[in-house]
């Protein structure tokens, strides 16, 4: 391969630039880094704090959702995203984002600056399979020397052993009426009041719809009441919904079916969503046929 065929990632940085770059990464965990042409982490220029794309908004909201789950008595909501960085680490099937956002705690009307480190990667499947993971979900702290550099995978990496095997591997098939009837004690049917009270259910549906656009049952426990399954750390959601901006040639709204598997390993800032989503026929809702 000639020099002209080399990619930027194959070209070494100037030693002095690399020294500054590494210091910035270590002191900010990758969130506050200047532009260096041959660096892995690069800032993405935004015209203003509202010029971010829809996927970045979704991932920022997922980071807030993760934080709210782990910090009782908080309800952080997104206000704007002033900056984010991308990480080119040579993984062709995935993207990594360091997102800095402004949020407000609706419980006490207190504003804050928030940081979340998120990855999205996808696999080939019959419909479209997306995995979104957070590694950091935190209030922004002071920048400076510390011992929690994101480059140390043992700090931010996932504890896979902490996740039950039921919530790993291939996603389950769509929940048919027969399966639901045979194991009704294992599942909780989400009520309309649940949807109104838990905005994160809308977030899961939006991420599922995003995965569909881009890539054209909770486990039984005798100690757990059905309603508590909705907020379990590890859960599987079977969702049917309509895209408000999508219309079938017949004039009807397009309906979607989605399986979302949520997993948490107990470490701060960690939540994983595995999403499989597909377009359904108008009568194809939960309790009916499997996906085509």
Curated annotation (Swiss-Prot):
- What domain of life does the UniProt record list for this protein's source? Eukaryota
**Could you tell me where the Acidic residues compositional bias lies?**
1-17
Q: Where is this region: Disordered?
A: 1-24
Pfam families reported in the protein's UniProt record: protein_MS5
Family annotation (NCBIfam families): A_thl_para_3677 (TIGR01572)
Assigned protein family: Belongs to the UPF0725 (EMB2204) family.
Name of the protein described by the UniProt record: UPF0725 protein At4g28920
Q: What is the lineage of its organism?
A: Eukaryota, Viridiplantae, Streptophyta, Embryophyta, Tracheophyta
């Amino acid at each position: 391969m000639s020099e002209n065929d080399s990619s930027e990632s194959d070209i070494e940085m100037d030693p002095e630039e690399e020294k500054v770059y590494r210091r910035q990464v270590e002191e900010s965990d990758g969130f506050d880094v200047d532009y260096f042409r041959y660096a892995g982490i690069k800032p993405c220029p935004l015209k203003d704090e509202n010029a971010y794309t829809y996927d970045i908004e979704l991932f920022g909201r997922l980071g807030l959702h993760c934080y709210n789950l782990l910090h009782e008595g908080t309800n952080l909501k997104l206000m704007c995203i002033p900056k984010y960085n991308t990480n080119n680490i040579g993984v062709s099937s995935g993207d990594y984002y360091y997102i800095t956002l402004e949020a407000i705690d609706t419980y006490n009307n207190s504003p804050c600056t928030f940081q979340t480190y998120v990855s999205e990667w996808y696999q080939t499947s019959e419909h479209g399979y997306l995995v979104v993971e957070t590694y950091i979900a935190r209030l922004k702290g002071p920048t400076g020397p510390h011992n929690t550099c994101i480059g140390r995978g043992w700090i931010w990496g996932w504890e896979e052993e902490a996740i039950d095997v039921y919530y790993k591997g291939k996603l389950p098939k769509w929940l048919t009426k027969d399966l639901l009837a045979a194991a009704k004690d294992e599942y909780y049917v989400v009520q309309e009041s649940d949807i109104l009270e838990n905005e994160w259910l809308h977030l899961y549906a939006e991420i599922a719809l995003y995965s569909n656009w881009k890539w054209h049952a909770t486990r039984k426990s005798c100690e757990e009441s059905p309603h508590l399954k909705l907020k379990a750390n590890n859960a599987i959601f079977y969702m049917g919904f309509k895209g408000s901006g999508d219309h079938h040639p017949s004039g009807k709204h397009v309906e979607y079916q989605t399986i979302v598997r949520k997993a948490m390993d107990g470490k701060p800032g960690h939540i994983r969503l595995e999403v499989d989503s597909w377009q359904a026929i108008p009568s194809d809702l939960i309790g009916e046929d499997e996906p085509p």
